From Swiss-Prot:
The gene is glgB. Belongs to the glycosyl hydrolase 13 family. GlgB subfamily. Pfam families: Alpha-amylase, Alpha-amylase_C, CBM_48, GlgB_N. Keywords: Carbohydrate metabolism, Glycogen biosynthesis, Glycogen metabolism, Glycosyltransferase, Transferase. The keyword Ribosomal protein does not apply. One of its GO terms (biological process) is glycogen biosynthetic process. Pathway: Glycan biosynthesis; glycogen biosynthesis. It catalyses: Transfers a segment of a (1->4)-alpha-D-glucan chain to a primary hydroxy group in a similar glucan chain. This is 1,4-alpha-glucan branching enzyme GlgB.
Length: 716
């Protein structure tokens, strides 16, 4: 049978048709129904009608185009194809109805689909009684998009997709299933072949260096149990253990622990240490280990380094079972330019800005999201909701917020483009951040968000309706820089830097602050936290004990990076385990015991956490004793007698009969002393309790241990 091919037929055969459904499949023709099938490498094809009748199709083009009449009146049919010596029966993807409804297209076009991940990506489903996978991807400027994978020999002609709405390409692939590997094969605006792309909405990906996406049936994922109620409240204790999953601990052969192995070990350790939360460095899929996850290519996929999405669910569930909240580092500020990723996705700057003065980070060599694009904002906002809904995550810490807020962030003069008012503020990014926080708290009111924001941008953690950005918390980067600078000085010089301890309290309640000693402070030549401590060996460890006690007595929630809790000597390395063997030595196990007791005290004393973010919870008592490097303040809870006196001595001297006024007469209990012998100290202190002196004003006469902090509470 000789078939005269149309231009449309050639467009399909050559892989440049935007809607192959217009040509392929069953179509009325000359009073009957013609079936057109494109099956590359097939040597013969038959069509089987719904009534069981079989008719051969003629090969109309050597690329694998077969054409012939459909037997019977029903539009349903099956194909039988021979590939060499193998004959298979298969369904024609071009006989099935669309995946996206008109309402789906409306929400996607409007950018308000909060469950974007239920529509885009790869979803196992059943259409007209046939099992398969529905694939949907955004590529508005592509000339042609195909899905390629294990189900079609990675041949881009086999499953060419159709475009609908404002650039959403879709196709139901019969016979594809969960576990299949796939990518999208695109022709750009001018018909040029683009690098094959991983699915931006994939729920799983291959282990690097491979880059294919993996079909996951998200409906079968177990739901982690919820975290303890109100674990993120401003009045609740929040002590966060920050963890890089690949280097917390390793097994024999220097191999990563899997999510399930981590689930058996990490939550128990975090609970034993008294932390309330664990914060994972980004778990979204990323190609380069050395980025620590901060250059993600798969925002919707837990990295395959440690297992499957089901395995990640098990880790979250184990944390919640141990009473631990789970926070994820989330990276909506930039992404890498790996060929299989989001960059130049459809042959144009789809997710990023086209102009490198807006679209590329000079520091990191990464691309910047275009927050002025409706589809991009929808993609990012839905991703935040995805982690909270699908995996039961309790909070998101947003990375590098300052780089999002300022158009001139780390750019030279003349190397950036002002906003429409001529200013440096990124108006679209600000709108996105506010929308993100609105959506998160609207859908998950007991969750939280935290901003890593290093500038003086006002009201980061204040309500949007009052002009704020809407975050729950802000990392206090100023406190971290000032206090680490102070503690790194030899005690003899600290009196000249006394203000670095005092200054943070001038703004301590302008935001809801988290005090971070994060991964960023123990890498790139900064040394470990212990490595910053001056003096001989005893002084180094005493300084560290005093500094940690100072941190836990200071207003604000707490965050400590793994390894710091036992005084790791060396800088953190992402490609090896923490130095757990150090705990064989008392000076390191003493630091660990100190952190465990500080966490316990912080959680048990309302005065230390109830008004963490409220100026009524803090009162300076001694600020001007610079010559002694000594500070004292009162922490307060809601109850009148919920009080905790904190005294920190950053000098190596012991001070006898040191007088401090207190609000209540009677006995005050020394509930914590960082100079305890159990922590490696000298056991100088007040014997566990002290009574106020006789007089009109209650006053304590105290013995202040060297390079140490003591906490005292009034007896009931």
């Amino acid at each position: 049978m000789t078939v005269q091919l149309s231009d449309e037929a050639y467009a399909v055969v050559e892989g440049r048709h935007a809607d192959p459904f217009r040509y392929l499949g069953a179509h009325p023709e000359d009073g009957g129904t013609m079936v057109r099938v494109l099956l590359p490498d097939a040597v013969a094809v038959e069509v089987i009608g719904d009534n069981g009748d079989v008719a051969p199709l003629d090969q109309a083009h050597p690329a694998g185009l077969f054409v012939g009449p459909l037997p019977g009146a029903s539009p349903r049919y099956t194909l039988r194809a021979r590939f060499g010596d193998t004959t298979v029966e298969l369904q024609d993807p071009y006989r099935f109805p669309p995946i996206l409804s008109d309402f789906d297209l409306y929400l996607l076009g409007e950018g308000t689909d909060q469950r974007l991940y239920d529509k885009l990506g790869a979803h196992p489903m059943e259409l007209e009684g046939v099992a398969g996978v529905g694939f949907v991807v955004l590529a508005p400027n592509a000339r042609r998009v195909s899905v390629v994978g294990d189900f079609n020999f990675w041949n881009p002609l086999r499953h060419q997709m159709r475009v609908r709405g404002s650039g959403y390409w879709e196709l139901f692939v019969p016979g594809a299933r969960a576990g299949d590997h796939y990518k999208f094969d695109l022709a750009g605006p001018n018909g040029e072949q683009l690098p094959q792309k991983a699915d931006p909405l994939a729920f799983a990906a291959e282990l690097r260096p491979k880059t294919a996406s993996i079909v996951v049936d998200a409906t079968t994922l177990p739901r982690p149990r919820p975290a303890p109620e109100n674990i993120n409240a401003l009045s609740a204790p929040m002590s966060i253990y920050e963890v890089h999953l690949g280097s917390w601990r390793r097994k024999e052969g220097d191999q990563w622990l899997t999510y399930r192995e981590l689930a058996e070990q990490l939550p128990a350790y975090v609970r034993d240490m008294g932390f309330t939360h664990v914060e994972f460095l980004p778990v979204s899929e990323h190609p380069f280990d050395g980025s620590w996850g901060y250059q993600p290519t798969g925002l919707y996929a837990p990295t395959s380094r440690f297992g499957s999405p089901e395995d990640f669910c098990a880790l979250v569930d184990a944390c919640h079972a141990a009473g631990i909240g789970v926070i994820l580092d989330w990276v909506p500020g930039h992404f890498p330019d790996d060929p299989h990723g989001l960059g130049n996705f459809d042959g144009t700057a789809l997710y990023e800005h086209a102009n490198p003065m807006q679209g590329r980070h000079l520091d990191w060599g990464t691309l910047i999201y275009n927050y002025g694009r409706t589809e991009v904002v929808n993609f990012l906002t839905a991703n935040a909701l995805f982690w909270l809904e699908r995996y039961g995550i309790d909070g998101l810490r947003v990375d590098a917020v300052a780089s999002m807020l300022y158009l001139d962030y780390s750019r030279p003069a003349g190397g950036w483009i002002p906003n429409k008012f001529g200013g440096r503020e990124n108006i679209e990014a600000i709108d996105f951040i506010r929308r993100f926080n609105t959506e998160v708290y609207g859908k998950f009111p007991h969750s939280t968000t935290a901003a890593e924001e290093s500038t003086a941008w006002p009201q980061v953690s204040r309500p949007i309706e009052f002009g704020g950005l809407g975050f729950g918390y802000k990392w206090n980067m100023g406190w971290m820089h000032d206090t680490l600078n102070y503690i790194s000085k030899d005690p003899i010089h600290r009196k000249y830097h006394h203000g670095q301890i005092l200054f943070g309290l001038h703004y301590a309640f302008s935001e809801n602050f988290i005090l971070p000693l994060s991964h960023d402070e123990v890498v790139h030549g900064k040394r470990s936290i212990l490595g910053r401590m001056p003096g001989d060996e005893w002084q180094r460890f005493a300084n560290l004990r005093a500094y940690y006690a100072f941190m836990f007595g200071h207003p604000g929630k707490k965050l400590l990076f793994m390894g710091s809790e036992f005084g790791q000597e060396r800088e953190w390395s992402h490609d090896r385990s923490l130095d757990w063997h150090l705990l064989e030595y008392p000076k390191y196990s003493g630091i660990q015991a100190l952190l465990r007791d500080l966490n316990k005290l912080y959680r048990s004393l309302p005065a230390l956490h109830q008004l963490d973010c409220d100026p009524f919870g803090f009162e300076w008592l001694i600020t001007e004793d610079a010559n002694r490097n000594l500070f004292a303040w009162m922490r307060k809870g809601n109850d009148t007698r919920a009080r905790c006196l904190v005294i920190v001595n950053f000098s190596p001297n012991v001070y006898q009969d040191y007088r401090v006024r207190v609000p209540f007469p009677g006995r005050w209990r020394e509930v914590f002393n960082s100079d305890s012998a159990g922590y490696g100290g000298t056991n100088v202190g007040n014997g566990g309790e002290v009574r106020t002196l006789e007089g009109l004003v209650p006053e304590l006469s105290l013995t202040i241990p060297p390079l140490a902090a003591i906490f005292l509470t009034p007896e009931d």
